[in-house]
């Protein structure tokens, strides 16, 4: 007899950090362009605005991935040259997804970029949730590495 895994809600976090040898302004220009994701996020086909507002709290974007999946995100916090926070409202197997991308100048030409998120799943098995967290961690790592390569050119 095969025991089925009980499905329930799960909560977790993902946090990834990378150091980039460039100016804080250059990093901020790249990450604060909220529809510029195809230039550094892996597997993103296109990103468009869903709001008239293009920057800051209230800006909304729709991300289309190469597999056709779409995610709608709303900017809910913004501090120029320091961080922005966004929530996903559609497109993920989650009840809640809140993420912040922040930058901190370590020295004149060294910037630390941190991408962290809080995740609360829809009903799924613990194994499925752990696989999802691992996927998100890999996605953040690969995307931050792309950002580093682009900005250190």
Which stretches of residues belong to each language-model region?
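Generic structural detector for well-ordered beta-strands
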Residues: 17-21, 48, 62-64, 74, ...
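A short beta-turn/loop motif at secondary-structure boundaries
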Residues: 51-55, 91-92
